[in-house]
Amino acid sequence: IRVSLVGSEMCIRDSSSGLQVYYGGNNEFFHYDKVILATHANEALNLIDNPSDEERNILSNFSYRENLAILHTDENIMPKNKDVWSSWNSFVDKKNTSKNSLSYWLNLLQNLKNEKNIFLTLNPIKKISEDKIIKKINFTHPYYDQKALDNQKNLKNIQNKENILFCGSYFGYGFHEDGIKSSIEMLKNLND
């Protein structure tokens, strides 16, 4: 068993002796009976050197959106009335209703005992004061259009078919818990 973080020079190839995984750097392939890809569908597809038509058709039907997360202490992004603050606070831009933002009030959500309120805001539509920013993180989330939702039922068709197993939040609603749930389900297929 080997656990590896995805690198830019990583690929998986099928061979007569099983799966070969190239980790880059020293031009060396490692041989495995099975490989688990616990990552986004698009990243999993990019890691497979020569995906089957079925793998390509299924994994390419999941889209992802870039997101900006800002960890901060700026209360000005929250509603003026503190009585309506909740763990999850959703905001919509009045001028452009397709723009929305979500702020997690981490003190309530994570039961933090800090003196200061701490927030995690995704894709802010209001400016967050620079001096109150703790960290900025860019990442991607699954984007659920009808194509992705319809395609979720097909994921079982590629599970362990080429000795490659898949898990990730795209098996569910995009939450961390969905990634965990999909890994538990994936393990049931490990010895098929």
Predicted regions and their residues:
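Short secondary-structure boundary/capping segments
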Residues: 2, 61-62, 155-157
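A short, aliphatic-rich alpha-helical micro-motif
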Residues: 5, 29-30, 159
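Single conserved hydrophobic/aromatic residue that forms the stacking wall/gate
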Residues: 1-12
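Conserved flavin/dinucleotide-binding core of flavoenzymes
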Residues: 99-192
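Mid-domain catalytic core of redox enzymes
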Residues: 13-142
